[in-house]
């Protein structure tokens, strides 16, 4: 076995408490002998056979599992993660809007600026101009953009929930989208499990979105790369979406991922609602006990399962990252979380996390509290806060990706045009985009990420 295999096997052997993706928590196994290519009896994921019915049957089960009381919903499987779903959704909007008379005209997409890098790359590939929304006031922005750009707008793209568990008012956004006949796409990558919360009202499809991108591997028991694209009756374009997916997808989808989705649906059909109810009880009990010993949680997080744990060290200075300090401490206790920022640690639990996992976590936090001085400070920091709202776009996204580039020291990049998107990953929200002018307001942030940066060679 090579080095990577050794590292991963050693991690698995130490039986870690996993509060990171994927949602399977290392508890599902598949025989590699079932990893095959498309054969006459396996069906073809991106061009399924209506007669064989294997893929369609599985997708129908997904609909019934996620939306048992809904009608006219299609679910399309992706083995290329949420990125492939986003690519397919945006290309479908473009194809749906385009016709021979206006296909050469500029097209726009109203977008949440705190969108994942996969959306940025998709816009660049398809030469679509983003109309950014920088605040939570989506309604006003959609109204204003619609009045200015009219029929040239392809639709609206929102991220909900985000990495920090902050959910947007999809119902209100969908209502204004209907007013202007705009298709609403929700990047629900971090909220697939919300279909099993209460009556499912927090899932974007149930809240009014036309298309939802569910990266099921993040919070549900499936293999990494498993995702599902849901669409409702307003954008009832299953064949168009599937055709668009074929443009970007590998012609060799993973049948191991497909099997994991099938196993996930079987598990969720039996345990989805009850299991998530128990998980929420464990999370709420953990929150209550952690608060008693001085820890705080992000009060902006409205996603009931996401844990944003804050502990600002009393002796903290500019040279001490409180979030990293707590993250590293938990790693030493064999507890591995998703990521950290300057003040917080983000944990992603799933239905496969046990009560014992939370007990072990709480015990570690009690030890931390007895050893270090810190004060409660609910996290208000988000990566999006570093995004400039007045960035100068010198070259559009599509052109910026195609032009010659050179690598220079970040210190020397002021007033240069970025040739790449720069972001911490996770959460993958770019602080600066290809084609934007690098200024002093974001240079210090960029220096935290990388010493060198690609700029347009002009």
Question: Residues of each region from the PLM?
Answer:
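Short, glycine-/Ser/Thr-/acidic-enriched flexible segments
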Residues: 26, 163, 218-219, 234-236, ...
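N-terminal "arm"/small-domain region of PLP-dependent enzymes with the aminotransferase-like
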Residues: 1-53, 182, 427
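Conserved PLP-enzyme active-site core in the AAT-like
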Residues: 4-9, 57, 65, 72-75, ...
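Conserved C-terminal alpha-helix-loop-beta "cap" of PLP-dependent enzymes
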Residues: 291-437, 445-451
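Charge-dense polyanion-binding interfaces
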Residues: 453-458
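Gly-rich Lys/Arg/Thr-decorated short loops/hinges at beta-loop-alpha junctions or inter-strand turns
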Residues: 36-45, 64, 125-126, 130-132, ...
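Asp/Glu-centered strand-loop micro-motifs enriched in Gly/Pro and often flanked by an aromatic residue
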Residues: 45-50, 64, 77-78
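Electropositive phosphate-/nucleotide-binding environments in soluble metabolic enzymes
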Residues: 2, 49-56, 83, 206, ...
């Amino acid at each position: 076995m090579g080095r990577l295999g050794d590292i991963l096997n050693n991690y698995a052997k130490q039986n870690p408490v996993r509060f990171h993706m994927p949602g399977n928590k290392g508890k599902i196994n598949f025989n590699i002998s079932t990893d095959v290519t498309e054969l006459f009896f396996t069906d073809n994921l991106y061009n399924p056979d209506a007669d064989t019915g294997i893929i369609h049957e599985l997708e129908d089960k997904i609909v019934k599992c996620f939306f048992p009381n809904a009608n006219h919903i299609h679910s399309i499987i992706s083995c290329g993660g949420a990125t492939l779903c986003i690519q397919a959704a945006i290309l479908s909007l473009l194809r749906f809007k385009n016709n021979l008379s206006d296909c050469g005209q500029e097209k726009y997409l109203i977008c949440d600026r705190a969108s994942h890098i996969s959306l940025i790359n998709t816009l660049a590939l398809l030469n679509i101009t983003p109309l950014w929304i920088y605040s939570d006031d989506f309604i006003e922005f959609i109204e204003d953009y619609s009045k200015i750009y009219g029929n040239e707008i392809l639709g609206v793209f929102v991220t909900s929930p985000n990495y920090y568990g902050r959910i947007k008012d999809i119902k209100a956004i969908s209502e204004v989208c209907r007013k202007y006949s705009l298709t609403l796409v929700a990047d629900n990558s971090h909220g697939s499990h919300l279909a099993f919360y209460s009556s499912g009202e927090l899932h974007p499809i149930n809240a009014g979105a036309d298309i939802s991108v569910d990266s099921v591997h993040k919070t549900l028991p499936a293999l990494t790369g498993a995702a599902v694209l849901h669409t409702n009756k307003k954008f009832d374009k299953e064949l168009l979406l599937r055709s668009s997916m074929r443009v970007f997808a590998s012609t060799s989808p993973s049948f191991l991922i497909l099997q994991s989705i099938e196993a996930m649906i079987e598990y969720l059909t039996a345990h989805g609602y009850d299991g998530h109810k128990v998980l929420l009880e464990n999370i709420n009990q953990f929150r209550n006990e952690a608060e008693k010993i001085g820890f705080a949680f992000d009060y902006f997080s409205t996603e009931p399962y996401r844990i944003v744990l804050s502990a600002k060290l009393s002796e903290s200075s500019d040279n001490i990252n409180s979030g990293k300090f707590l993250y590293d401490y938990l790693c030493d206790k064999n507890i591995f979380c998703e990521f950290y920022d300057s003040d917080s640690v983000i944990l992603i639990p799933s239905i496969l996390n046990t009560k014992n996992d939370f007990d072990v976590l709480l015990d570690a936090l009690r030890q931390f509290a007895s050893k270090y001085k810190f004060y409660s400070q609910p996290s208000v920091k988000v990566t999006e806060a570093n995004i400039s709202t007045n960035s100068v776009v010198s070259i559009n996204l599509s052109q910026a990706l195609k032009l010659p580039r050179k690598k220079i020291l970040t210190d020397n990049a002021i007033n240069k045009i970025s040739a790449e998107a720069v972001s911490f990953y996770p959460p993958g929200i770019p602080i600066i985009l290809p084609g934007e002018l690098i200024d002093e307001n974001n240079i210090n942030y960029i220096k935290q990420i990388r010493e060198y940066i690609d700029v347009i060679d002009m």
